[in-house]
Amino acid sequence: MKNKVNIDVPDAILEQLDDSVFESTNYGNPEIQRVGPKVRATTGESKVQSSIDDVLSNTLKDGMTISFHHHFREGDFVFNKVMRKIIDMGYQNLTLAPSSLTNVMNDIVIEAIKKGVVTNITSSGMRGTLGDAVSHGILKNPVIFRSHGARARAIESGEIKIDVAFLGVPNSDEMGNANGMNGDAAFGSLGYALIDAQYADKLVLITDTIMPYPNTPASIKQTQVDYVVKVDKVGDPDKIGSGATRFTKDPKELKIAKTVNDVIVNSKYFKNDFSFQTGSGGAALAVTRFLREAMMAQNIMASFALGGITKPTVDLLNEGLVNRVMDVQDFDKGAASSMKLSPNQQEIDASWYADPANKGAMVDKLDVAILSALEVDTNFNVNVMSGSDGVIRGAIGGHQDAATAKLTIISVPLVRGRIATIVPKVNTVITPGDSIDVVVTEVGIAINPKRTDLVEQLKQVPGLPIYSIEELQQKAEKIVGQPAPLKFTDRVVAVAEYRDGSVIDIIKEVAD
């Protein structure tokens, strides 16, 4: 069955997932019944355990669904520690449902798949050796990729039923009151883990620092926690987040960032109390810097900045240019350390951030979003998941969610090396073109023709080169030529869902 973005989804996949095809970015106002976790009452006994082995014996069975968060990023020690125990204890047929998978997790997940320990995965994304292995058919069942908002929705609705959540935290007291702001391995907001804490049947905290009771502020609360496991170390602070922010000096990135800024400040959305999400890449950080200068020059103050937060965004808060920072994750130490000092840097969970099936998410109030891409096609569809070789090497993250902003800008170079980024058709549609308003490259911009208001506004800007998306695609092709067609088998190795749970695309096994 074909969906709205002209992807033919096999009926067998729809039946296997009990799913429907993507039809619209408009979620509407359905009435939804949420699920609740099982709770075993306790009366104040310490929950601290010295061994993960006993906890696994008491909580985990074959066929269950387990979850982790990715806030430690490449500095994560918890995931591998727990998965090693699970493999060694011989568990089978588990569903792995983390908020995302980072490179440091790849080797042990591949081992778990080969040994039959993990037979299903749902995640925001994957990269490196794991992405390559899945793309070549290592996993028994298709991976399901969901955005951060869609994952929250799926957990709340029971589509993802977490039996046991293993959440690493830099601190906890003996009852399970914990936060991400204090300790050697502090990473700031626990945003993506909080939904697991709320809905998992069993919640296991793993920490290297036991604090006096009661430990506050408590992002995760003792009312949610079953066990606290003390370990030597939960993470490497130097790999959790970057240190001092380094602004890009790359001329191409700076040109893109300057053009993105020109689009924003010349749009109707650049006014007092506007809101924005900028991201964490080199060009995104440069946009934040240019935006700061424009806000100061025009005496404009933003109501809130949203999403993954960086030190430059926190600086805007401290300078009085942003009223609130709504923080679902922190990308650097500066952002992570400031949360405990500022009441205006608010920790939010993934549902509050981006869930379409609640009573109002932050993305619903977002004016401007600046997002990146691996590819954009002539229908403005965006791929952030698979590379030019067809191999999985990315993550949906909050891309689909933030793209619901009133002004969604994709910042992307025209080509990367010898690979075009503006193409006739993307390998994998992740964010539909209906969500995208402007594509910005170093040579110029393309405006979605459906946005006639933006066309009228931006064509008045002196020196702003405007092309059709087809013209940008042709410029890219002239530089790098046409690539050879990719070869795939008929086997589906992954399914990309839209934020409402419908199937927006499928990823097939790469043929060698």
Swiss-Prot record:
It catalyses: citrate = oxaloacetate + acetate; citrate + acetyl-CoA = (3S)-citryl-CoA + acetate. Its EC number is 4.1.3.6, 2.8.3.10. It is found in: Cytoplasm. GO terms for cellular component: ATP-independent citrate lyase complex; cytoplasm. Signal peptide: none annotated. The keyword Lyase applies. The keyword Lyase applies. InterPro entries: Citrate_lyase_asu, NagB/RpiA_transferase-like. GO terms for biological process: acetyl-CoA metabolic process. It comes from the Bacteria. Keywords: Cytoplasm, Lyase, Transferase. Coiled coil: none annotated. GO terms for molecular function: citrate (pro-3S)-lyase activity; citrate CoA-transferase activity. Represents a citrate:acetyl-ACP transferase. Oligomer with a subunit composition of (alpha,beta,gamma)6. This is Citrate lyase alpha chain.
